[in-house]
Amino acid sequence: MAAKIKKGDKVVVLTGRDKGRTGEVIQVMPKEERALVRGVNIVKRHQRQTANQEGGIISKEAPIQLSNVAVADPKDGKPTRVGFQVLEDGTKVRVAKRSGERIDG
């Protein structure tokens, strides 16, 4: 199945404590059906001290379920579903169902 959400996409969180927040996808994990989104789902982790890194509590992004995010429409930034369209030259591009705008280049 073709990837509807890719690294670098602007996405909107649909559910959870970060509902309505937008961010850029840092990493997609298709086998786990999860994605890392910059600035969303921040958790605190206790870091053990090592020779080159000091210990303490650090904040970092945790993966979020792909079903809980939607691609932001390039036109107005609202969440949209993703469709696919084949151009005349045979290339397949992602299209926002909401506005019909192309998501890929």
From Swiss-Prot:
Quaternary organization: Part of the 50S ribosomal subunit.
SMART domains found in the cross-reference section: KOW (SM00739)
Family: Belongs to the universal ribosomal protein uL24 family.
One of the Pfam families matching this protein, by short name: KOW
Keywords: Ribonucleoprotein, Ribosomal protein, RNA-binding, rRNA-binding
Keyword RNA-binding carried by entry: yes
Molecular-function GO terms, alphabetical: rRNA binding; structural constituent of ribosome
Any single GO BP term: translation
The protein's name: Large ribosomal subunit protein uL24
CDD domains xrefs: KOW_RPL26 (cd06089)
Superkingdom of source: Bacteria
InterPro entries per the UniProt record, alphabetical: KOW, Rib_uL2_dom2, Ribosomal_uL24, Ribosomal_uL24_CS, Ribosomal_uL24_KOW, Translation_prot_SH3-like_sf
Functional note: One of two assembly initiator proteins, it binds directly to the 5'-end of the 23S rRNA, where it nucleates assembly of the 50S subunit. One of the proteins that surrounds the polypeptide exit tunnel on the outside of the subunit.
This protein's record includes keyword Ribosomal protein: yes
